[in-house]
């Protein structure tokens, strides 16, 4: 019920996509059933497009999500194939690619991007953008690392705004027809990342994220309207 009411609140603010995001390797058992019930309820009572992010699911689970009304699945590849083992040890880069292929086989569109500022090179960022292009991804979130105390990357130096903007421009150049989405970390940029929309970003994930707070919907709407964008 809480999820349904939250979805309705966001729909009233003209948000056109609503996503449930869970942590962990994969949502299974009773938790998956709970998520499916929530998706069915939202599909019945709301007009927003439904998105999901539940880890490394099986083909059967992707089929069930599709039947429950989910239209898009979120599965970040995080970084380049070369850099992935430096960031994640619980699963492989190929596991990520296989999950994307399963979601696509179930008839879901896929939202996939990554995190910048984790110590990767420019070559890693370019390779990540090329991989997403080869997968046919049309929704690419770019998250900016905000080091959190107690995590392995807590001492990672923050990216300059210029480097962030150049990275966004590269992703736009390699993926000219995709929605390049500003995601977590952009509220650390000047004016909530306003310049990023002039550098190639043409979408944003608004509201709170899994581990960090995000921008208020009203603030994003005002900023984008002032820049002349159609919402």
Which positions does each model-derived feature cover?
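Auxiliary Fe-S-binding modules of radical SAM enzymes
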Residues: 5, 133-231
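Core AdoMet radical
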Residues: 1-6, 10-100, 109-113, 138-143
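Conserved strand-turn element in the central/C-terminal portion of the radical SAM core barrel
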Residues: 18, 24-28, 99-123, 142-157, ...
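Anion (oxyanion) recognition and catalysis
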Residues: 43-44, 104, 225
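Conserved, mostly hydrophobic/aromatic
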Residues: 20, 75, 103, 132, ...
């Amino acid at each position: 019920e809480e999820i349904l009411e939250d979805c309705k609140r966001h729909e009233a603010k003209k948000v056109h996509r609503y996503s449930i995001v869970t942590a962990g390797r994969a949502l299974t058992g009773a938790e998956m059933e709970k998520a499916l019930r929530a998706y069915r309820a939202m599909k019945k009572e709301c007009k927003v497009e439904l998105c999901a992010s539940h880890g490394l699911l099986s083909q059967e689970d992707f089929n069930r999500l599709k039947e429950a009304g989910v239209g898009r699945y979120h599965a970040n590849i995080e970084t380049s194939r070369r850099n992935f083992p430096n960031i994640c040890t619980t699963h492989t880069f190929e596991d990520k690619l296989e999950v994307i292929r399963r979601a696509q086989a179930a008839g879901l569109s896929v939202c996939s991007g990554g995190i910048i500022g984790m110590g990767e090179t420019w070559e890693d960022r370019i390779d990540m953008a090329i991989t997403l292009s080869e997968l046919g991804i049309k929704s690419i979130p770019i998250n900016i690392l905000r080091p959190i105390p107690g995590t392995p990357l807590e001492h990672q130096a923050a990216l300059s705004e210029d480097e962030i903007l150049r990275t966004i421009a590269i992703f736009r150049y390699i993926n000219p027809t995709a929605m390049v989405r500003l995601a977590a970390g952009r509220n650390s940029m000047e004016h909530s990342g306003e310049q990023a929309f002039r550098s190639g970003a043409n979408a944003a994930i608004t509201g709170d994220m899994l581990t960090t707070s995000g921008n208020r919907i009203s603030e994003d709407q005002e900023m984008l309207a002032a820049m002349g964008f159609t919402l």
